Amino acid sequence: MQTESSSHHRNLEALDFLSLVQGINQEDALLHARVASEASHIAALCELVFSRLQAGGRLFYMGAGTSGRLGIVDASECPPTYGVPFDKVIGIIAGGDGAIRKAVEFAEDDWDQGILDLEEFGVNEKDVVIGIAASGRTPYVIGALRACRERGIATGGVVCNKESQMRAVCDVCVEVETGPEFVTGSTRMKA
């Protein structure tokens, strides 16, 4: 899995701040072409979401850790930016709202909790659920998406590795190969 592989940058603690900033910028510069290579999947996911919203459904984001927080941020910005009601785009994070500010260890490993969290909102076949996971293998997210597909609920995924496990439980999956992080394993940086 590329996001978890060793960084190309060594001895970070010995570098000055300018070198650190330049190294991070070099890594980030690689992403534009990689995101562009997924344009058709990104467009397909947008079409899926649009069709569900047009039909009266809602958009749910599911994630753990930073991925869950990013879904919550986007859901929070949609009402003021696009004028949609606050209950139209909903972000859900493993571990509940307390995990927004403080990590809830091992919440991401629960295969069954994701669908239970969605059920609290009355998720149904009009809705679309997008899982967000840098690794593409987070049990909380995959379990929720699998349960949604079994119930006829549209699913999508946003992943930072190719050929992820999430692809198997998504109607549309965007898989951007972000590569190793500047700080090995720190997927909140680039992924």
Model-derived features: positions:
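Short secondary-structure boundary/capping elements
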Residues: L12-D16, H41, F106-Q113
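Cofactor-/ligand-binding subdomain signature composed of acidic, glycine-rich
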Residues: M1-R34, E38
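A short, well-structured juxtamembrane/interface segment
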Residues: S37-R52
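Short secondary-structure boundary micro-motifs
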Residues: S6-S7, F17-L18, V35-A36, A44, ...
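Flexible, glycine/charged-enriched surface loops at secondary-structure junctions
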Residues: R34, I42, R167
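Glycine-rich phosphate-binding loops that contact phosphosugars or nucleotide phosphates
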Residues: F60-A191
